[in-house]
Structures are given as C-alpha cells and as structure tokens.
C-alpha cells in the first residue's frame, strides 16, 4: 500500500501544506512535508479539528449537524427591445439539526439563568429594603442626637446666662467696692500729700529762717546788698538772698509746689518712683530728693524688681556668704537681706550649708549647680582600668584564738619556719601576713595578736578576711578571748573553721571543746551545724593537711574571685615607721596587680612604690590578688584598714590625700557620734529593719542570760535587739573595741569598765551605761527602741483662703488676692490649690504679704496676697488650703 505523505494529504483535502502542518502541530503531532501520515494520526487530527470547531461528546459524535443545499436554475427575464435574457439563479439553503439532549441542556441552562436572575432580583429587593430600614434608623438616631444636642445646648445657654447674670452682679458689686476703695484711697492720698506739703513748707521756712539769721550775723559785710534788696525781702521773695542755703531751700519748696498738681493726676507707682537728679536752680551739685509717692495702704506692695543677670552658681557642701554673693555678682548685703527675709540671720563671713545656699540662690533667680566636695576623690578612684574578667583567687584566712592556744605555731608549721621562737615570750607582738603554696593551692594567712587588728580593720570598713580559723586548745577549752573571737567573727559575717589544737596531750578532751562551743552557736557539721571541726597538733604536725583541705573546701563554697589584670587595690594590714626606710606598709592586694613604680593612695597618705618585699624580705616587682607585700615610698604612715588604691596621676593623688586630711576631723566626730543611744534613730536606713546592737556585761552568768533573754523578747518586726557580745566580768578594752566596730552601746549590770576600756570608750565616744536594777535597764532599752520606730504622720488643715482677685507681678508671676475664711495661713507650711473642691495643685507658698509687708501668718478674716511657687494658673474662686504634717510618736506595745 502506498504511504500517504503530508503533502499528498494536503492536496487531497484541499488545504495548504503550511496550514496542515500547523494543524498537526496543534494536535500534538510534529510533521514535515515529506513525512508519511498513518491512519491513527489522521484520526487524531480529525478529532482535534472537531473539538476546535464544535464540542463533541466522548464518542466524538456531533450534537449539532448543519446541512447546506445549493440548487441552480435558469430564469428568463425580459430585456430591452423585446428580447428575453436568461439569468442563472442559485438558491442556497442551510439547515441545522440539534440533538434532543442538547436542547434539554439549553432549556436547563435557560432555566438556571432565569432562576439566577430571579434570585438576584430578590436579593436586590431585600438589600434595598435593608438599606431603607438602616437609613430610617440612622435618620431616627440623628434626629434623637440633634434633639439631645439642642436640649443640652439650651441647658448650657441657660447655665451660661445664669452664670453671666451672677458674674455681672458680682462685677457690679466689685466695681462698687473698687470705686469706694478708690475714693477712700484718693482721700487718704490727698490728706497725705497735704500733710507732706505742709511739712515741706515748714522745713523750707525753717531753712529760710536759718538763712536770715546767718545774713543778720554777717550784716556788716552784706549791708550794702541788704539795702538794695530790702524791698524784695518785704514781699517774701527769698530768691534774692545771698545765702546759698536759703536759695536751695526756696528752690526745693518751689519745685514741690510746681509738682503737686502733676502728682495728683498720676497713679502711684511705688516701684518706678524715683527722686529727681537735681534741679536747674541747684548749685554746687547738692541735690535734694523730691517727695517720693508712696503706695497707699489699700494696695499690696509687690514691687517690680530690677532685672538681674542670671548666673550658674556652683555650690559645694559649705560656702561662705561673701563667696556666694561673689558668685551671684551681687553685694553680700543683698544676700544677707534675702536670708533675713527667709528667716535666717547670717553675717558676711558666716559659713552656710549647701541647702541654705541653694534656697538663697534660687530665691534671687539664679540657677544652682550642686557640687560634691569629694568629686575629685570619686573621679580619681573611678579612673581605673579593671575591664578584665574576674578569676578565682586564693582565700585570705585569719588565725584567731586565746593566748597560747597555738595560733602562731599552727601557722609556723604550715610555713615550715620558726617564727614563734623569735617572738618575745612566744607571744605574737605584731601583725604578720603570709601566703603559702600548698599541694592543693595557695592560701594567705593573717596572724593577729588576739583579734585587735581584725576588729580595727572592720571598724574602718575593711573586709580583708574571707575565712576565720579559730584555734582552741583541747586541754584548756573555751577561754574568754575564744568567746570574743567568736563574737567578732559572727559580727563580721565570716565563716568559722574550728581547729582543736594540742590533741597530742594526755589531758586533751576534744569532745568537751565541742560541747562548750555549742553553747555559743558554733555547732559541728556532724551534729547538724555549719562549722567544720579539725583536730590538729601544731607541734607534731598532726592533721595539718586536713585543716588546709577544710580551708580550701570552704573557699570553693564561697567562690572567691578577683580581677587579676589592671590597676591594683587592697587594704593596709599593718604599718610602721622604720628608722632607716621611712613609712612601711603591709598591703594585702585584693584585686589587680601591684607593680613597682605604681602611684598608691592609702587613706590620707600617697606616694610612688619605691620598693616591694614579700613576707620573706625578698625584693619583688609585682604582686597579684591575695598576696601580702611590704611597700616603701608613702608620704606617711597609713592606718590599719585603710584602702590602698593605685591611681594614674600623682598630683591628683596628693590633692585627694590633702582633702582627706582636712576632712579627718569631721569624719572622726561623725564616727564618734554614731554609737550614741540618742542617735540610733538617725542611723536607720529607710525600708530596713532597725537593729539596736548591744554589748552586755554582768556580774554573774545568770544575770547575763536573764537580761539577754529579756532584751531579745523586746524585738519586733521593725526593731531588733542584736546582742553582739556578752559575758561575765568587768568591761574590758576588747568589749569597747567590739562596740566601736559594731556601732553598739555597752550595758554594764553591776560591773564597771577598767582604765584601758574607759580610755577607749572616751576616745571613740561610745555610749556606756551602768545599771543595778534590771527593770531600769529594760525600760531604757525599750525607750531607745521606741525612738527607732518609723514615725507616723498625718495631715491637719490649719487654714483656708478664698481667691478674690488675681494680680500680676513681674518677679513672682500670678499673685492671688485672698480672704482668709478659716484658720490661719502660715508661710512655712505646704499648700493645696482647690478648684470646685478638687485638688489641682500641691506645693508651697513663695510669698505671703499683708499689704506691702512680708508676714509669717495671716489670721481668719484678713486679706492677704499669696504667691504660689512654680504655679501661675490661679483663678478667681479658687481655694488655697494650708496644712501641716504632724508626727505621731510611736511606742512599743
């Protein structure tokens, strides 16, 4: 069978080849001119063409069939000249047949269309109805709103009309009162001016009479002139007299007479009235002041002040009055006047505090800049480079305990050196600071004589110790200094490790030591307490490693850290004056690294580190945290507990040291005053529970326990009695030192203080009280605790003033002219401004005047002028309420 090509197919169906190729391509068949066409491809093309020209069902049968019929015939038509003409007529007919299913679909589509149109019509009608209803509802709401607005407007208009009527009535009454007052003022003014005129005339006549007498005395010399002017003298024309005094007096009288009519026409302006600078007839430059028009008694004397250039006034903690005046560019007398108006008397050389100086400067219209005296000190100490991260450091351990219980021997065995043998009598005579390298790490030890240095440093605010090791001899047990060491450690809040020493002795009884210490709240861990007990023998070295492990374990719990890099800071452990080397200070570095050549500020002393030695006397170049070193090069001997800080600038360090020396006396006085029983209330911190620290000594143990129990029962939620130390026997120096460090009072029951303790108490200005009756002791402590209770306050209204008028003052702003309706208005009390019985401002009075005078108070029924500080929105009808805050003293229930 011959293959049918695309070209042959195009010729067969009468379609151009390009069109046929395009149709094949549309049908998804790619062909060229010479490609053959299979029967299936022809069917695919046919189906594609049918789909393109009309929809087909799944069987490809058409739903619509169109038949075209064409018939040709010849028609004879008569032409011109009687001839007929044959015309070819072709009739074309076209008829379309549609399947029944297609008709049904068309009907169904038409029906759906009709239903959709009907539904749309119904929806449109419903929407129109809803819109009409909403429109009607909106119109009704708008109508109701308009009616309500009209009603409210009518009500407001009626109220405004009533208010205007009341205001007009009040205005008429006020106008009438003002006219009456004005009339009275004019009458008073006329009387005053008439009186002034009479006085001036009398004075002028007196001067003229004196001039006449002078002329008569010099009659011989002026005889010729007197004869020429005798006629003028008879007519009382005194201008021609030769006396300069007479001419001046007459000129002054004439000027006053000429100025009288003009003065009556002018209003009184007290702030602007000034005396004339001489007249045209004055001679010799001697000016006579003209009559100054004084304000009447019906006017308030708020004068317009001269404009003063505002200054930025820097005020320290104290300032001399003359220095304050100089900074404000005014005379010192002006400052004293302002202070007198404020109720403070001062002289030109008097020193006033910062708060008073601030009030005076603000009163005179200047801007105040408050300066701290220690700004330089803060700037120097804050200029430090300690940005490095904190790292772990070695613990600082203080060895404490009773005399000869083995403190130095324990430390000596650890250091592997015989320090104790070199001491006088085997007792430690000076403070030693050492650091030792153990297998488990480094530890720094402070060996103190008893606990004096520990307490002295804590009294100065230095917290150099991390852990306290309490050495107790197993054969002696708890001794007085052991108890004091426990009290000091607890007061400092430092963890305590007990080293029970001398367990190698035959009469050693460690269990007895535990029982005795348990009475002072030192409970072993095996008994459920928090204190570690280590049994050691300093002489034989028994269990020394166990003590070191306990120290390092406690330091791990504390998580001790310090900055290793950067500028160093530390605390002075001990200091002395060496004969050959000058001031020598033992410094415990707490953070940073101390290098040779650094500039160090130690309390009131400063200097460059010329040399550094460790505890063995070896020269070193630097020392890190927890390392004790001896430094040389300070300007003087610092005190134990002073903070040692490395600074950048030696000049600023010298300035800070000089400033601290100047303030030392004030600081000492303040420190002496803080332990007074009467000052306990001032030492309270707001929001914290107040503590009354007590050191209690009695004659017998029973009294100590009874008094301590009674004092503890006095504690409340607000005030707590804290017994920092107690014991049997007289009051010793250690008791006084503990009281000074703990800010405590000393109570002695049937005991007395020895000479050394009395000297310490006197130097520290501590509060020492003796008692022989227990109830008297309890009552006085109870009264002191009552004084430490936070007071209660209530407000009492003492006066009420009604604002009748408002004036404007260039200096004070809005001034309220008031009538005191209730109580008394006092200048020094706080006030409230009420409008329609609602508080709109709370503040204080800036000015209170009665007529032109400043007054301290105005009583009921009198008028006054009130200036409210920092508030100018005072209106007529306002009320100014003056109240005072009354303190209600509280007592213990």
Swiss-Prot record:
It holds the Pfam family IF2_N. Residues 501-504 are annotated as: G4. Residues 401-408 are annotated as: G1. Coiled coil: none annotated. SUPFAM superfamilies: Initiation factor IF2/eIF5b, domain 3, P-loop containing nucleoside triphosphate hydrolases, Putative DNA-binding domain, Translation proteins. Residues 426-430 are annotated as: G2. Residues 51-203, 216-299 are annotated as: Disordered. Belongs to the TRAFAC class translation factor GTPase superfamily. Classic translation factor GTPase family. IF-2 subfamily. One of the essential components for the initiation of protein synthesis. Protects formylmethionyl-tRNA from spontaneous hydrolysis and promotes its binding to the 30S ribosomal subunits. Also involved in the hydrolysis of GTP during the formation of the 70S ribosomal complex. This is Translation initiation factor IF-2. It comes from Aliivibrio fischeri (strain ATCC 700601 / ES114) (Vibrio fischeri).
């Amino acid at each position: 069978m011959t293959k049918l090509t695309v070209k042959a197919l195009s010729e067969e169906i009468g379609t151009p080849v390009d069109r046929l190729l395009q149709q094949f391509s549309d049908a998804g068949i790619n062909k060229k001119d010479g490609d053959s066409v299979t029967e299936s491809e022809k069917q695919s093309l046919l189906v594609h063409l049918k789909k393109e020209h009309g929809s087909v069902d799944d069987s490809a049968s058409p739903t619509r069939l169109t038949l075209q019929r064409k018939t040709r015939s010849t028609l004879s038509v008569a032409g011109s000249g009687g001839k007929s003409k044959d015309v070819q007529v072709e009739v074309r007919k076209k008829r379309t047949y549609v399947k029944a299913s297609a008709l049904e679909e068309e009907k169904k589509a038409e029906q759906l269309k009709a239903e959709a149109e009907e539904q749309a019509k119904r929806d449109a009608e419903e929407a129109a109805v809803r819109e009409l209803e909403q429109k009607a509802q909106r119109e009704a709401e708008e109508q109701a709103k308009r009616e309500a607005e009209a009603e409210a407007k009518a009500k407001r208009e009626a109220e405004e009309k009533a208010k205007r009527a009341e205001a007009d009535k009040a205005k008429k009454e006020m106008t009438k009162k003002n006219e009456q007052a004005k009339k009275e003022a004019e009458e008073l003014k006329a009387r005053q001016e008439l009186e002034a005129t009479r006085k001036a005339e009398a004075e002028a006549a007196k001067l003229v009479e004196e001039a006449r007498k002078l002329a008569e005395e010099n009659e011989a010399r002026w005889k010729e002139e007197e004869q020429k002017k005798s006629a003028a003298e008879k007519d009382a024309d005194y201008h021609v007299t030769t006396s300069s005094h007479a001419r001046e007096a007459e000129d002054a009288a004439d000027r006053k007479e000429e100025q009288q009519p003009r003065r009556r026409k002018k209003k009184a302006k007290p702030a602007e009235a000034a005396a004339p600078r001489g007249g045209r007839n004055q001679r010799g430059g001697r000016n006579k002041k003209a009559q100054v028009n004084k304000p009447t008694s019906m006017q308030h004397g708020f004068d317009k002040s001269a404009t003063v250039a505002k200054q930025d006034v820097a005020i320290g903690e104290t300032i001399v009055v003359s220095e304050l005046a100089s900074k404000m560019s005014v005379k010192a007398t002006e400052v004293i006047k302002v202070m007198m108006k404020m109720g403070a008397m001062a002289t030109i050389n008097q020193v006033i505090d910062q708060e008073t100086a601030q009030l005076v400067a603000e009163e005179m219209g200047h801007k105040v800049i408050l300066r701290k005296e220690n700004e330089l000190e803060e700037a120097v100490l804050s200029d430090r480079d300690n940005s490095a991260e904190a790292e772990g450091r070695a613990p600082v351990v203080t060895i404490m305990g009773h005399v000869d219980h083995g403190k130095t021997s324990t430390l000596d065995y650890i250091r592997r050196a015989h320090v104790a043998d070199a001491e006088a009598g085997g007792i430690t005579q000076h403070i030693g600071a050492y650091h030792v390298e153990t297998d488990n790490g480094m530890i720094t030890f402070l060996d103190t004589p008893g606990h004096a240095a520990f307490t002295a440093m804590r009294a100065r605010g230095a917290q150099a110790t991390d852990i306290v090791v309490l050495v107790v001899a197993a054969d002696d047990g708890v001794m007085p200094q052991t108890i004091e060491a426990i009290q000091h450690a607890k007061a400092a809040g430092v963890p305590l490790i007990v080293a029970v020493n001398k367990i190698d002795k035959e009469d050693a009884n460690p269990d007895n030591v535990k029982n005795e210490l348990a009475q002072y709240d030192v409970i072993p861990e095996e008994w459920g307490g928090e204190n570690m007990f280590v049994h050691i023998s300093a002489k034989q070295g028994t269990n020394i490693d166990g003590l070191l492990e306990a120290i390092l374990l406690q330091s791990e719990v504390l998580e001790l850290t310090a900055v290793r890099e950067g500028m160093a800071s530390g605390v002075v452990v001990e200091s002395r004056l060496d004969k050959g080397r000058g001031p020598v200070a033992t410094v415990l570095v707490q953070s940073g690294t101390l290098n040779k050549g650094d500039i160090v500020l130690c309390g009131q002393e400063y200097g460059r580190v010329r040399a550094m030695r460790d505890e063995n006397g070896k020269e070193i170049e630097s020392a890190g945290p927890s390392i004790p070193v001896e430094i040389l090069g300070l300007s003087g001997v610092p005190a134990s507990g002073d903070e040692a800080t490395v600074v950048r600038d030696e000049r600023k360090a010298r300035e800070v040291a000089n400033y601290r020396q100047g303030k030392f006396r004030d600081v000492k006085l303040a420190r002496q005053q803080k332990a007074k029983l009467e000052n306990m209330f001032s030492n309270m911190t707001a929001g914290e529970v107040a503590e009354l620290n007590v050191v209690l000594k009695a004659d017998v143990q029973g009294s100590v326990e009874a008094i301590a129990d009674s004092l503890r029962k006095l504690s409340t939620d607000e005030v707590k009695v804290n017994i920092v130390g107690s014991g049997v026997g007289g009051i010793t120096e250690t008791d006084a030192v503990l009281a000074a460090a703990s800010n405590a009072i000393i109570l002695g029951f049937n005991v007395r203080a020895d000479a050394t303790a009395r000297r310490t108490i006197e130097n520290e200005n501590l509060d020492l009280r003796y008692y022989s009756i227990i109830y008297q002791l309890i009552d006085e402590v109870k009264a002191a605790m009552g004084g430490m209770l936070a007071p209660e306050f209530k407000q009492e209204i003492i006066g009420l003033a009604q604002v009748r008028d408002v004036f404007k003052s260039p200096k004070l702003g809005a001034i309220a002219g008031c009538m005191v309706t209730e109580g008394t208005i006092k200048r020094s009390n706080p006030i409230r401004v009420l409008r329609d019985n609602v508080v709109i401002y709370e503040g204080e009075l800036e000015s209170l005047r009665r007529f032109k005078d400043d007054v301290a108070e105005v009583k009921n029924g009198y008028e006054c002028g009130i200036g409210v500080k920092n508030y100018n929105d005072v209106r007529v009808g306002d009320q100014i309420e003056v109240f005072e805050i009354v303190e209600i003293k509280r007592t213990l229930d």
